[in-house]
Each structure stands twice: as C-alpha cells, then as structure tokens.
Amino acid sequence: MQWKLNYREPAKEWIESLPLGNGEIGAMVSGGTRQETIELNLDTLWSGSQKQSEPYPDLPDWNHIRKLVFESRYNEAEEYAKSHILRDWTAAYLPVGTVDVQMLTENGNNEITEYKRELSLNDALHTVHWIEGGVTYQKETFVSMSDNVLVMKISTDSDSEVKVHVSLRSQMPCVCRKSENMLVFEANAPVYAAPNYYQCEEPIRYKENSGIKFGIMLKPVLKSGTIEKNENGLTIRTSDNFYIILIGKTDFDGCDNIIEFMSDILKCAEYKGYKQLKQNHLETYHSFFDRLDLHMGESDDYFEKTDTIQQMKAFEKGENTSEFATLLFHYARYLMICSSKPGTQAANLQGIWNNQMRAPWSSNYTVNINTEMNYWMAESCNLGDCHTALFELIDRTVKKGKITAQKLYGLEGWVSHHNIDIWGNSDPVGKYAQDGSPCQYALWPMSSAWLCRHMWEHYCYTLDGDFLKDRAYPVIREAVRFYLGYLTEYDGYLVTCPSTSPENCFLDRKGEKHSVTFASTMDISILKELFATYLQICKILKVDVLEKETEFALKKLPPFKIGHDGQLQEWYRDYRETDIHHRHVSHLYGLYPGNVIKETDQELKKACEISLNRRGSQGTGWCMVWKASLWARLKNGEKAFELLKNQVNLTHTTEVDMSGGGIYPNLFCAHPPFQIDGNFGFAAAISEMLLQSQNNDIELLPAIPEQWKRGQIKGIKARGGYTVDFSWKNGKVYYIKISALKEGNVIVRYNGQISRFFFKEGQNKVCLQKTGRK
C-alpha cells in the first residue's frame, strides 16, 4: 500500500508546506511551480551556549515555603517561589534560512495544468508535477537518510533550455558568498532569544564570536549548461535534467571547521550522483519505515482517487474513517523517523520544523507532557532506536540536573522541571514572567522522574540488559536519590511540597485561585511508578543501593483519593478546578501513560472515567489524543475514536487557542499553534487501541471501535520483547503470529478468550489461523 499526502495546488503558507527530514536536516517544501521555497532547519541550531546563563543565588529556604503551603498561605508561597526559586528562560530552537528556487520561463503567462504535489510516506520523497506551455515539469526532493544532504532534482520532457535561479536567505545576519558554482553562507546564532510571550526591548541578542556557528552550502550539479553567479545567487541554464545538493552544519558537536566539513560531505555526495544518493536514501529509510505495516478499511485505491483535503473532510463527516486514521498513523511514524533518527537530537515541540526566530514556547522541550508524548509511540510502533535520541538529551540533562539539585535544593541526585533545551538546562524557568502566575507551570520538579520512565520502557520492549545496567540504571538511581531527599512528612505520609498539577489551578475554600499546594496526584503517581520501577531494576541487576530507603518511601506515599463528584482527585485536598475542562489531565498519569492504576482497580478506574467525562471531549490537539489513549486504556474504543475524530478538525489558525485543537492542511497537529506531539500521540492512541501489553500479557483489540471493522497489522511491538502480527474482521481476530526475543511464557487475550504460549528465544509462532475470513 502506498501512503501519501497529495494536493492539487502549491502551499500558500508554512502550515501547508510538506516536511522532509533525516533527524538532522529539516525542510518544509512549498511545492511551488515558478517559485519554490524550501525552509530549512538543523536540529542543533539553538540560541544560548553550554555556559550557565546566570549564577545561582543563595539556597532557597524550602522549610519556609513548605510551612506557607501547609498553612494554606498559597499566595505567599507563590511569591516566595517566584522571587527565590524560578530562573531565566531556556534557549530557543531557531530556523536556518530559506532556499528560493525560481523557474525563469520565457512566457510567465502560460497556463499551468495537471498540477500535483505529493509526499510519499513509503519513500520519504516529495514530488511536484505540472504542465506549462506544453512542457511537463517535475521536481523530486528528499533529505537523504544516509548521506546527510538535501537533494532536489528538476526535470522536464523537453529539450528546450531551462533557466532556474537559486538563492539563500536567513533571518539572522550572515555572510554569503559564491564560489566554484556554489552558494555558501555562514552565521552565528544569537546568544539569547526570548520566548514570544515575553516582551522586552531586545528579544534577540547577538554577541560577537559567541553563539552556535552554522553554515549552509548549496551546489547545482549539471550534465551540461552554465551556472552564472550574480548578486542574488546562481542562475542555471541547461537543456538537461539537473539536481541541487545542499548540506548544513553547526559547531554544536565541537566541529572546528564547518566549511571544510560541509565541503567534504558535498564532494562525496556529488561523486555518488543522483541515482546512488536516492538509492542509498531509500534503503536506509525503508529499514525504518518497513518494520511495521497497518492497513484498515476496505478501499485499497482510496488515496489515489482523492486528495488529502478531501480525505480529511470526509473523515470529519464520519466517512472512510479507517483509511484516514491509518494515514495519520503512518504519517506519525514518518515524522518520527524524519525528526528523531538515531544519532540526532530528540524531537522538540515542533519536531525539527520551525520557521520563526521566536517560535511558540521557543520550540523547546516541554517535559510536563509534550516531549514525553512525542515518544509514547516509539517502542510499540517498532521505532525504539529513534527513542535513543531522547536518551541522549536525558544524559545531558542529568549533568545539569545534578547542579540544579545541589544549588537550588541542596540535595544529591538530579532533577529537571517543565522546560529543558538542547544544553540540558534543568532549572525552573519563569523568573521574568509577565503573566503573574509562572508557578503553575514552572514549579514542578517532576520531569526527571517522568523521563526515567522512557528509559525503563525501552528496556521493557527490548530486554536489553546492557542498556538497563549501563544507561538506564545510573540515571534512574540518581533521580530516585533526589526524590528521596525532596519528600517531606505530612499527615503521616511522605509528600511532595511545594507541588503543582501542571498548568492547572484550584480554588481554595475562599474561592481564590492558586496553583501551589502539596502532593498533587500527578506527583504521587509518578513517584509510585518511579520507586516501583527502581525496585524492579534492583532485583533484575541484583543491586541494593537505596533499595531499603525506596521501599520505605513507596509505602509512605499517600493513596489515591476520590473526590466530590466521584472523580479521581487532582490534589491531596478535594479542591475544585478553576477550569473543569483544562487541557492537562495530569492526575490520570497513573492510568496512562503510567501503569500505576491496574486493570483490577475497578474503583479507581471508575474515578478516572468520571474525571475524563468531566474534562470533556474537546481541547488542544495533543490533549484530545491523550484522552483517546486514556479511554483506550479503559477499554472504551468508541470514546477513544470520538476523541481522535474530534482531533481531525481542519484549521488554519496559528494563534494560541487552548480549546480549538485540530490539524493543519499538511496534517501537522494544531494545538493551535503547531505542536508535533499531537501527531505522535495520535499514533500512540491507535497503537493502544489495537494492542495493550504488560508483564508478558498481550491483549489484542482491547479498544477497537465499531468503525474499524477490518484490518491487519504487522510488526507492532509488545512489552516483554514480542513482535506481533494479527488480522481481524468485524472486531474478531482471525490470525496471530508472534515472535519472541527471549524464552518464556506469554498470555494472549483475544475474542474474549485467553491462550497461553511458550516461546524459545528467537522463535516465531503462528498462534491462530482461521480460514474463511476474507
């Protein structure tokens, strides 16, 4: 099956352009005919530097702020936190620049017909096709997964001369030169880029010989013809097909001479030639994309007959829901490969695609949900090696997080808060906030524990003992060490204080709005899971460092509580939310993505269901797919599907809207504005609806909606080291094949029955095969 996005006109704005990438180079291609723009990104182009931005003040008086909280003097606690604990903003992810490709036709008044642009998800290729003046034109563009260059081939079916002008531009001051039929520019990123919501006199600040150094090198490769240098770029004249090679590089990794580095890469790419570059790219990309295949629905030629906008509108009406949901699933896999290929940086708020110097929320790593949601799909969707980009970020954050723990808390271990950046900055931000309430998002020292969950998940899916011992264990151990020190006694329990439920606020008994309290349900859920995970690791690795202390602390954490409406309480006390429909459903972490609330916890599951119904079925793009996964965990496929359907709401707005979530014409998730987490979360929700696994127990179709009557999936992963293929019709599974990494027993639940199987290491086994299910 060929999965593609296809359109009948060029992009008019960024949210209509189509994304290409290889984890390091990102490109948004407009698909223009006479005027093409390719907006570029490099995964390591950020503001700031490795150096600490500001010195730490004296250690805050944590006993004082805890006293204020326990005495319900919340306003005073928040004021103290803002003035003594919060610090400067993180660095910002930045755009590199733009390639302009102009077709200089002799008669610009010719009618353009049979226009089509496509993004092949199977091949990671962008193509544009049109006819003008009796000549057929085609542009084929890819960002090589193997040779680390962007390549665009321009071809026609005519022997007539083609005249094309190519130029580069950037929003940052740069030095541009033309040499040896090439365009080269160099620049330095700003040392400071303020968030777009922070107003100041100098939001973008440069410092001579400071900031990340970066460059772009572009070269047309011709069989025949001429390349003319001019003030604005290069003008190409040729009667043959030709292609353009582009390479970008920063000195983030310590590269001493980025120009020499790019020149070597470009020469190597030119030597290989277009055919070899494309073949190498396809082989590498297919090694990721072809691991898994999902097909749902009845129509095999649906995507050939209709364009993407038509498909989206049909889905909104409840038509062809299986096919379009499957397309969005594969699009998420495509975006993961393109933005988080092993060896590159972790996908940020916008993956690797950003065209603004002051992007929404600095396009950083927001780790109170968004970054984590990016990777919920990674393991189950057979892209566990793409997950490793996040682990590299975690390793850098651990180093800074140890300093934060020591200087800000006076504790051992490591900690991070709701924002981090490429440098691993782990401090709570918001010191200079102008909204008056930064604590509701900033005073949350729990992301380090949540990030640990991802390392444990990687082990659960891969059973990689070396990874657990050498990589995950030290990180998780030091996080546990911090939280053991951070917990404090209250009411016979060990609680977090101060504590928030990310970005949400509550009303106290006087009806006043606050965010800072103690023992939020999310905090406690995360710590219950972290401590239980650490104890499991101790048993697996036969180590006992902090084991007794962790066992004691786990038992002393407060229990979950059920509130006034039967809902799972969001805070230790039964406060009312200021916004009952708030986008964050943080108190349900223990249900999903966590596994603290078990299948057998019927009372708590009912409380979670009530909480979800109270929150409603609308919200931001990422919020709706989180709720879909929560409903899937509750085995309610119809509710999960309702949320996915609500998320497919075509929008063009890029203004912040906390309840207007949807998707853009290029299928990017709209918060709005664009955030890529909703794309990845959509795939995670579908994965959870099709297969759930815990402790060598696999359930197939646990939350399948009525609309998805027929389908098959190959290559989906389950915890315990299993790879599963299965097919279904009318909600009933009729074929199952499982392969196992390690020897052991597994329970498989399907069609209301339970089967048990034993596997030898590396064994493949057909567990169910029924005929007559065509």
Model-derived segments and spans:
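Aromatic-residue-lined binding/catalytic grooves and analogous aromatic/hydrophobic interfacial grooves
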Residues: 1-439, 457-459, 477-480, 494, ...
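Charged/polar positions within long, soluble alpha-helices
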Residues: 290, 337, 485-488, 536, ...
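Alpha-helix capping and helix-loop boundary segments enriched in small/acidic/polar residues
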Residues: 319, 361-365, 378, 435-446, ...
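Short, surface-exposed recognition loops and adjoining beta-strand edges that mediate ligand/DNA contacts
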Residues: 346-364, 489-503, 667, 700-711
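Well-ordered alpha-helical segments within folded domains of soluble proteins
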Residues: 369-379, 445-456, 522-532, 586-595, ...
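Non-catalytic carbohydrate-binding regions of carbohydrate-active enzymes
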Residues: 456-462, 467, 472, 479-489, ...
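Acidic/histidine-rich catalytic neighborhood
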Residues: 478-537
